[in-house]
Each structure stands twice: as structure tokens, then as C-alpha cells.
A protein has these predicted regions:
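Short catalytic/signature loops enriched in Gly
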Residues: 15-16, 173-177, 269-333
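Conserved ABC transporter NBD signature motif
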Residues: 77-88
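Conserved ABC ATPase signature
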Residues: 181-186, 190
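Conserved ABC ATPase "signature" region
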Residues: 88, 142-151, 155-177, 230, ...
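A short, proline-enriched helix->beta-strand linker immediately N-terminal to the Walker B motif
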Residues: 201-205
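P-loop NTP-binding/switch modules centered on Walker-like glycine-rich loops
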Residues: 55, 69, 208, 212, ...
């Protein structure tokens, strides 16, 4: 992996809030073993905003799902470590992991309409996230609580007030009225705000945002990103943003990781990655971005196609598409 030089010594010396060490997630298929995440490592500091950028199918979303141990069978996390506050999450029991998931590390999923339950009011779905982690008493639509959990229940009135404040904080207008409404009665932007409210309900230290603006128009995209930025500033919540939009990552994030074929190929501050990209793939992504300027410039698409993750070529996975590939690229990653 190409790493940009000159990163802050202070950042490297700080104890990271979240660290991935040689994380590998695989999926057995008829074509062979797909290494969706192929031994990646990164460090996330408290309060930091980190972007993971790459083409569709490169492993960005699987990386986030791996952090929360939400990989469905037959997929499995085959190796590495996921260290959160000095604990390896892969060593936790399923019960211990449930206490981390949604409370300490929460996730905003890509498609709000398929994530929200169409049968329950939005306000009750936000309240349920409090109930699952023992902060609230069960509402009328709550799921059964796992056995052996001790609830720290607040009064029902204060619970609803907390949900209403949260709905207001994420920009859901008239929260008292919207509390009883169902997901189909919300616009796409409001559905995404509801997902963010669910993720923030237990005041997590890390928020994983998987393409949070994909299905939204440009104006609503800007509002959602402004909301996430405000959450980061007001609450100190660390954010990992997954996106295919390099411009968006450059505007929103402090550091950027570029991912290709299950691997991190470049990592650095926004200035390092955007101003002085070292990996040919990063340079190719930047050349694909249309610019509004007086200078007329032809967009240069990256030739070829993303490799089959069940048959990634040896060496640098980008070599078959790279105009500057050398013989060493066929053997060295």
C-alpha cells in the first residue's frame, strides 16, 4: 500500500479509538473464495472523520459490516483484529458484542427505506434502540429483550422526550406529529435523518456511515452532510464515511483511505491524497472527476474493469488497468 508521508507524529502516538489490524473477510462462492476485505489496517482517533473511497464492489461496505461483526453466513471474518478501546471485538461473545453494537459503535446504512421497519412508527423505532441497550422501558412495538440483561429504565415520559429531542436535533420537523408516522410517510431525506437518529440514540463514540447520501438529491445530500459534521463537532463522535465520491470525502473528511479490490492502496490527509496522490489508482479517480473551470479538459476514464475478487491477479491488483505498470507490479502489491 502506498502511504503518504509526513503524517502528524502526534496522531501516530495517540492511542486510537478504533484500530483494524490485517482484517480479512471472505465469502466462499462457486467461482472460488472471494476476499472482499484482504488484510486491511487503519487507525481511527476519537473525534476524527475518516473517509473510505473506492468503486462499487471494492469492499468498503463489507469493511464496515466487519467492524460490527454483521457478516452473514457463509461469509466470515477469517483473520486480523478489530480493536476498540483496547478490546479486540473479534474475541467478544455474541452477547458482549450486542452491547457494543449500536451503543458504542453505530451505523447509518445505505438505503433507509429497506432499513426502517415499515410496520412500526418511526418514533418507536428510535425508542427501541434505547430499549435494546437498557436505557428505556419497552414500548408497545419493542422486540423481546435478550435474557439476562439488566435494564436501566428511564420514566416513559422522559423516554419520549428524549426521542423527540433527538428527532428535532437531526432536523425532523414537528417531531411530536412525526413520532407516530410510518417510514413511508417520510421523504427520502427524512428517512435518512430517522436512521441517523436511531444511530445516535445511545450516543455512540463511533458512527459508521455507509453511503448516507446515495439516493438523495444534491440539496438534501448537503443537508445530511452538514448534519453529520455538526454531530461530529458538538458530540465529538468519530465518523467513518464510506463513499464513491472523492470530492465529497475531500470536503467532509480529515483523512482519506482509497480502497481497491479489497485492499487499502493509499492513505493520508485530505491534502496529501488530493494534492499529491502516490498510487496510480488514486490519480485515475481524480482524473475522472469533472471540473467547472475556464480550462477545457477531457475527462480521462480508467480503462479496463474491476477484477473479479475471486481471482485477483498476483502483485498489484490495479496493474492490469495501469498505464504505468512495470514488471515489479506483477509480483509486488
Amino acid at each position: 500500500m502506498h502511504r503518504t508521508s509526513g503524517q502528524s507524529q502526534h496522531t501516530s502516538e495517540m492511542q486510537p479509538l478504533l484500530e483494524l489490524v490485517d482484517l480479512e473477510t471472505v465469502f466462499p462462492t462457486r467461482r472460488g473464495l472471494v476476499r472482499a476485505v484482504a488484510g486491511v489496517s487503519l487507525r481511527l482517533q476519537g473525534g476524527e472523520i475518516l473517509g473510505i473511497v473506492g468503486e462499487s464492489g471494492c469492499g468498503k461496505s463489507v469493511t464496515l459490516l466487519s467492524i460490527l461483526r454483521l457478516i452473514s453466513s457463509p461469509g466470515q471474518i477469517r483473520g486480523g483484529q478489530i480493536i476498540f478501546q483496547r478490546r479486540d471485538l473479534l474475541a467478544l461473545s455474541a452477547r458482549q458484542m450486542r452491547q457494543v453494537r449500536g451503543k458504542d459503535i453505530a451505523m447509518v446504512f445505505q438505503d433507509p427505506l429497506s432499513t426502517l421497519n415499515p410496520a412500526f412508527p418511526v418514533g418507536e423505532q428510535i425508542r427501541e434502540s434505547l430499549y435494546i441497550h437498557g436505557i428505556s422501558s419497552p414500548g408497545p412495538h419493542a422486540s423481546p429483550q435478550p435474557r439476562g440483561w439488566a435494564l436501566r429504565r428511564a420514566r416513559p415520559a422522559s423516554e419520549k422526550e428524549r426521542v423527540l429531542r433527538l428527532m428535532s436535533e437531526v432536523g425532523i420537523s414537528s417531531p411530536m406529529d412525526r413520532y407516530r408516522e410510518y417510514p413511508h410517510q417520510f421523504s427520502g431525506g427524512m428517512q435518512q435523518r430517522a436512521l441517523i437518529a436511531i444511530a445516535l440514540a445511545c450516543e455512540p463514540k463511533v458512527l459508521l456511515a455507509d453511503e448516507p447520501t446515495t439516493s438523495l438529491d444534491v440539496t438534501i445530500q448537503a443537508q445530511i452532510m452538514d448534519l453529520l459534521r455538526r454531530i461530529n463537532r458538538q458530540h465529538g463522535t468519530a465518523i467513518v464515511l464510506v463513499t464513491h465520491n472523492l470530492d465529497l470525502a475531500a470536503e467532509f473528511c480529515q483523512r482519506i483511505v482509497v480502497m481497491y479490490a479489497g485492499r487499502f492502496v493509499e492513505m493520508g490527509t485530505v491534502e496529501q491524497v488530493i494534492e499529491s496522490p502516490r498510487h496510480p489508482y488514486t490519480r485515475g479517480l481524480l482524473a475522472c472527476i469533472p471540473r467547472i473551470s475556464a480550462e477545457r479538459r477531457r475527462i480521462q476514464p480508467i480503462s479496463g474493469a474491476v477484477p473479479d475478487l475471486a481471482a485477483v491477479p498476483p502483485g498489484c491488483a490495479f496493474a492490469p488497468r495501469c498505464a504505468n505498470a512495470r514488471p515489479a507490479c506483477q509480483t509486488e502489491s
